[in-house]
Amino acid sequence: MAATMAAQSLLSIPVEYRSQVWCRANLPYPPAPQLPIPAVVDILTKASQALPQISFSWTLIDQPPDGSLFLVWQAPTLPSPPDGMHFMSNERFFNMDVAGKVLEIHEAKHGFYPLSETRTMHVRCRYRLLGVGFDNFWLVHYFQGSETDSIPANISVAKPPHLRRYPLPDVKTSPFLLQEPKKHIPEGTALSQRETLPNMGSAQMKSQSRTPSFSNVTTSPVPPINSNATAQTAEGHMGATNMTVDNMNKPSIPPNGNTSILMQEDLEIEKGDVMDKLSPQQICTARFIKHAEWMSQVLLTLQSVKDIEPPALWQEPNSMEELGKELKDNKEQLVKQDQKYQSLQGDLSYTDSMSNLLKEFSNIKSAEECDVLQKKIEEFAEAKIVPLSHVTERS
């Protein structure tokens, strides 16, 4: 149910903004100008324990102020959605062992907002705990960088290279849960007895018989232990007292002599397997995460859908004649492209030579030198005439 609500909320957002939204937790963290590493581990640990009570929403993040702190869900294989900040350096990541836990840190320095800042002033750090089943949840922290590490901002070489389009719409979906809270199972049910049976002690078994109820199988209650009972009765009581899930497949012999043989197939059905430990909510959550990662890769690709050609089915291999003809056509096409490239390179070299001659005018000190240089330029211009078609093709 939780995964379905998250998917429906994402589909309610316009298509052009689905790759820009963050799955952010609705937790009002106070501003933190500085955040020590132990505090990061403590926040992520508490968030992993309280995950069934934390609601999330799809929303846009744009130019967060220094000290902002967010808990977000994001697949590790996908890049971070845009947040309005551009960086002059690549994001680096490293691991750190803190209190027996592995903390992965992604640090992006030299951040700036291109519409209002001319120097890099911000740092973004993303943290996540590894090996605790919380790998897709990140703590994102924005803070001010060091003044000595500030450099001039240049949007032409920054990452990401494209500016964000403004104004942005107010996108925020209804809150949803990524993991539903565990439901309380009333004591006395078959599932409750199955879970509590391995932890029962012999004292509890003596005071009250609590054998699980199997379908299509009848068992006799175990009477209380009597010190005057026969050896056979005492042996039957010990078998019932020390019964566990591992030896329940053995037939029990009650004291009255009535034997109930439990079939092996019924016992396997009753005990279940590994998949019985997964709730429908956990299965839906896993499917949603898998599909969300796949759809994010599809939406972020630069390949147009109409240009994707399906593979040919049952295509027979080409003959040697067809392969030879195809190879010949490819070679001719490569020759034409090489000739065109050489022609364009000649135009570029001519332009560079002309530019160098014109730059020599700045070093002229006499009229004689000016006349000599002017003569060189006229001779060079007459020797090389650029066709108009080349100019139009390049423009």
Curated annotation (Swiss-Prot):
Subcellular location: Cytoplasm; Nucleus
Signal peptide: none
InterPro entries: Ssr4_N, SWI-SNF_Ssr4_C
Keyword Transcription regulation: yes
Region (Disordered): 182-230
Keywords on record: Chromatin regulator, Cytoplasm, Nucleus, Transcription, Transcription regulation
GO biological process annotation, one example: transcription initiation-coupled chromatin remodeling
UniProt cross-references to Pfam families, sorted A to Z: SWI-SNF_Ssr4_C, SWI-SNF_Ssr4_N
Function field: Component of the chromatin structure remodeling complex (RSC), which is involved in transcription regulation and nucleosome positioning. Controls particularly membrane and organelle development genes. Part of the SWI/SNF complex, an ATP-dependent chromatin remodeling complex, required for the positive and negative regulation of gene expression of a large number of genes. It changes chromatin structure by altering DNA-histone contacts within a nucleosome, leading eventually to a change in nucleosome position, thus facilitating or repressing binding of gene-specific transcription factors.
Quaternary organization: Component of the RSC complex composed of at least arp9, arp42, rsc1, rsc4, rsc7, rsc9, rsc58, sfh1, snf21, ssr1, ssr2, ssr3 and ssr4. The complex interacts with histone and histone variant components of centromeric chromatin. Component of the SWI/SNF global transcription activator complex composed of at least arp9, arp42, snf5, snf22, snf30, sbf59, sol1, ssr1, ssr2, ssr3, ssr4 and tfg3.
Protein name: SWI/SNF and RSC complexes subunit ssr4
Origin species: Schizosaccharomyces pombe (strain 972 / ATCC 24843) (Fission yeast)
Classification lineage: Eukaryota, Fungi, Dikarya, Ascomycota, Taphrinomycotina
Gene name per UniProt: ssr4
